Swiss-Prot record:
One GO MF term attached to the UniProt entry: serine-tRNA ligase activity
InterPro entries reported for this sequence: aa-tRNA-synt_IIb, aa-tRNA-synth_II, aa-tRNA-synth_II/BPL/LPL, Ser-tRNA-ligase_type_1, Ser-tRNA-synth_1_N, SerRS_1_N_sf, SerRS_core, tRNA-bd_arm
A GO cellular-component term linked to this record: cytoplasm
Record-given protein name: Serine--tRNA ligase
Lineage of source species: Bacteria, Pseudomonadati, Pseudomonadota, Alphaproteobacteria, Hyphomicrobiales
Family of the protein in this entry: Belongs to the class-II aminoacyl-tRNA synthetase family. Type-1 seryl-tRNA synthetase subfamily.
Pfam families in the cross-refs: Seryl_tRNA_N (PF02403), tRNA-synt_2b (PF00587)
Pathway field: Aminoacyl-tRNA biosynthesis; selenocysteinyl-tRNA(Sec) biosynthesis; L-seryl-tRNA(Sec) from L-serine and tRNA(Sec): step 1/1
Cysteines joined through disulfide linkages: none
Enzyme class: ligase
Length: 428
């Protein structure tokens, strides 16, 4: 959510940032809506002030025994009372029109975000190469999984339709191991507090993190006012909703392993086989709440925490700084981590780490009280995948596959697998 006062103070800068996002200028429209809101407020206030003044005049007229004047004034008061509901309604409608327009506008990109229209404008930030020899070519994860009978898309389709999977046996255990490994890393080494949040949230929570109203069609609704979370970012960030934190409490760092649900699982016809794009998947999420001057530093820290997962798994990856045309609606700046998948001979996104500034905090009314009497301001919010568990499973399967169809278990995961060192391939 944007600050209309900041827009009024520097409309040219606001429009320049929208232009970087590929949008037309909107400051004039927003200022006109705000003028209408102010006009409605002024009209309601003027009517109330007039009623207050008339009440005093009526008292004076009665004291002077001027009944005619008192009757005339009371008639005007009655008229103003009749008009009051309409003035209040106009005030509410004007405020709603402004708020709805502001809520539909994406966040302003930071100055150092590279320009670009789509993913082709993204810029490599850094990379990490595995100590293991890169496979020149390999089987895709679904070929490996289906051959063992431990990855069953046909059974999932009978249960739920397309873009679901049933994992069995050691593959199910491997996915569970990945999630537990990530949680232990983030809580034990990175200072995050583990949270087990609801996966059903109210509409206000989805609005707070900006999934609603713009991305309503991409979500799963459940009942009159419940939504299945598309990411644990929603409940974790909303933990500070409608609160005022002490600056000494910051930063807050939360992590959670949850199922995530997305009605729109990706572009039509893309990644139709396998686990890359699903309606339901597990993900470890990282969320930080900081003071404004600390958010840029926290963004780099969060990125490093997500990278540590892949480094300990010894997986090749690269970090991309997303351009203005590819970053998310609520983001000021985003880093994507893309892991190498030999089956496709390409990099695929496995984590996205974003700093949102006060954009979400304004929608949630999440504030903090600064030290030394510097007043109350909005916190900054950050979120990142730490990482997507299903995609980590894909990366492990494809990068650790063997010619016989077996999969070697990375050493970091073996303690979570009861000492198992490999998942056997299909028996001939």
């Amino acid at each position: 959510m944007h600050d209309i006062r900041a827009i009024r103070e520097n409309p040219e800068a606001f429009d320049r940032d929208l232009e970087r996002r590929g949008l037309a200028p909107l400051s004039a429209e927003l200022i006109a809506l705000d003028d209408a809101r102010k006009g409605a407020v002024s009209a309601a206030q003027a009517a109330q002030e007039r009623r207050n003044a008339l009440s005093k005049e009526i008292g004076a007229a009665k004291k002077a025994k001027d009944e005619a004047r008192a009757t005339e004034l009371m008639a005007e008061v009655a008229r103003l009372k009749e008009e009051a509901p309409g003035l209040e309604a106009a005030q509410g409608e004007a405020a709603k029109a402004l708020d709805e327009r502001l809520a539909a506008i994406p966040n302003r990109p930071k100055d150092d975000v590279p320009p670009g229209a789509d993913e082709h404008g993204n810029v490599e930030y850094r990379r990490f190469d595995s100590s293991r020899e890169r496979l020149a070519q390999g089987r895709q994860h679904f070929e490996l999984g289906e051959a063992t009978g431990l990855m069953d898309f046909e059974a999932a389709a009978k249960l739920s339709g397309s873009r679901f999977v049933v994992l069995k046996g050691q593959l199910a255990r491997l996915e569970r191991a990945l999630g537990q490994f990530m949680l232990d890393l983030h809580t034990g080494e990175h200072g995050y507090t583990e949270v087990v949040p609801p996966v059903l949230v109210r509409e206000e929570a989805m609005f707070g993190t900006a999934q609603l109203p713009k991305f309503r069609d991409d979500q799963f609704a459940a009942g009159e006012n419940f939504w299945l979370i598309p990411t644990a970012e929603v409940p974790l960030t909303n933990l500070v909703r409608e609160s005022i934190l002490a600056e000494d409490e910051l930063p807050l760092r939360f992590t959670a392993l949850t199922p995530c649900f997305r009605a729109e699982a990706g572009a039509a016809g893309r990644d139709t086989r396998g686990m890359l794009r699903q309606h339901q998947f597990n993900k470890v999420e990282l969320v930080s709440i900081t003071a404004p001057e600390k958010s840029a530093e926290e963004h780099e820290r969060m990125l490093a925490c997500a990278e540590a997962v892949l480094q300990k798994l010894d997986l090749t990856y690269r970090v991309m700084t997303l351009c203005t045309g590819d970053m998310g609606f609520a983001s000021q700046k985003t880093y994507d981590i893309e892991v190498w998948v030999p089956g496709q001979q390409t990099y695929r996104e496995i984590s996205s780490c974003s700093v949102c500034g006060e954009f979400q905090a304004r929608r949630m009314n999440a504030r903090y009280r600064a030290k030394e009497g510097r007043g109350v301001g909005f916190v900054h919010t950050l979120n990142g995948s730490g990482v997507a568990v299903g995609r980590a499973l894909i990366a492990v399967m494809e990068n650790y596959q063997n010619p016989d169809g077996s999969v070697t278990i990375p050493s970091a995961l073996q303690p979570y697998m009861g000492g198992l060192t490999r998942i056997e391939g299909p028996k001939n």
